[in-house]
From Swiss-Prot:
This is CRISPR-associated endoribonuclease Cas2. Mg(2+) binds at D8. It comes from Streptococcus mutans serotype c (strain ATCC 700610 / UA159). GO terms for biological process: defense response to virus; maintenance of CRISPR repeat elements. Its EC number is 3.1.-.-. Its cofactor is Mg(2+). The gene is cas2. NCBIfam families: cas2.
């Protein structure tokens, strides 16, 4: 299953921008993938992982702004249509799992 997270936060003051950056870093550290500026998704193995993620989101909920969550099956997520100006090179629509062990890959020259 996939959790789709959409959020809207104010960024008018320095404090609001700091809260936005902190929340975004939290999402990335939890394994969310950015689809658009305020739309992220995360692959979840089962409903208990979904419940646990919701609890962590509640703990890290910013004081200002709105967060919307939608959980869909992999089949529903795979039917998502991406319309963009270039060829689709997104890995976000894949249900493949990647596991990186050890150090980062060397840069190709």
């Amino acid at each position: 299953m996939r959790m789709i997270l959409m959020f809207d936060m104010p960024t008018d003051t320095a404090e609001e921008r700091k809260a936005y950056r902190k929340f975004r870093k939290f999402l990335l550290s939890e394994g969310f993938i950015m689809h658009q500026f305020s739309v992220y998704s995360k692959l979840l193995l089962n409903n208990s992982a979904n419940t646990a993620m919701i609890a962590r989101l509640k703990e890290n909920n910013p004081k200002k702004g709105n967060i919307t969550l939608l959980t869909v099956t992999e089949k529903q997520f795979a039917r998502m249509i991406y319309l963009n100006g270039e060829r689709d090179t997104s890995i976000a629509n894949s249900d493949s799992r990647l596991v990186f062990l050890g150090e980062a890959f060397p840069d190709e020259t």
